[in-house]
Amino acid sequence: MEVNDNLPFMDGDAAYPESMADHVLEGADWPLFAPPREPVSPTDHAIGLQIARLIPDGGTLQIGIGSIGDAVAAGLILRHQRPGDFHDAVMALEQNRPTGTSHLSAFREGLFGASEMFVPAFLDLMEAGVLSREVDGACLQAGFFLGPTDFYQRLRDMPDQERARIAMRPVSYVNELYGPEDEKRRARVNARFVNSGMMATLMGAVVSDGLEDGRVVSGVGGQYNFVAQAFALEGARSIIAIRATREGPKGTESNIRWGYGHTTIPRHLRDIVVTEYG
């Protein structure tokens, strides 16, 4: 086990005593890996607004790292703090004909977070009063945290009372429903599991981690686990965010395909796919 004083200590069931380690390395306080936050494009913001209206008050939220997760958080904060502006933005995107269920009002109960990765967007939501529904004293359960340097500093500066509202859990606890299932079902009410993909097919499959020529773009991470959870939890939904187009060698290409030679999420687990157009 390596001890690094630069790493903010976040408590929870994931903590374990020093006696469990065969060896403890101290004094090597290396700079932390601190990936910068990606710029949030207008396309990302449009997707974030579309998703923010799908999140019910009193529900549960999972998001991952990246600009779309930040855009979803920005949309939720706008909805909570300036619901009139949020309503107008959604109506403009939907040309005053919103499809599906829309949750447009500010949060009264607030949201509970359950996510493999604790990203800066969750801290933004906590500070804005959106992430406020507590279960056993915590408003967020997460497996690990990652972010830029200022994110780590915000965690270090956090008052103990606020830090106690973040419960670090084993990844296996957050990503799966089995184990203390009744406990998890009680916490993960009306869950919305939000993940990003590169492409989706008209049959419902999602491509997130690789290309059909075998090239690996990313790991699957917990995406499959959370999509599967959405089908196992009452009232839960899986939401896949995909930019409608990309720039290819021959110009603009659609990310909504009839079929594709690689699949991350199979078509039988299809649910909600959101682009900047709806």
Where are these regions (language model features)?
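Conserved alpha/beta enzyme-core scaffold
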Residues: 1-277
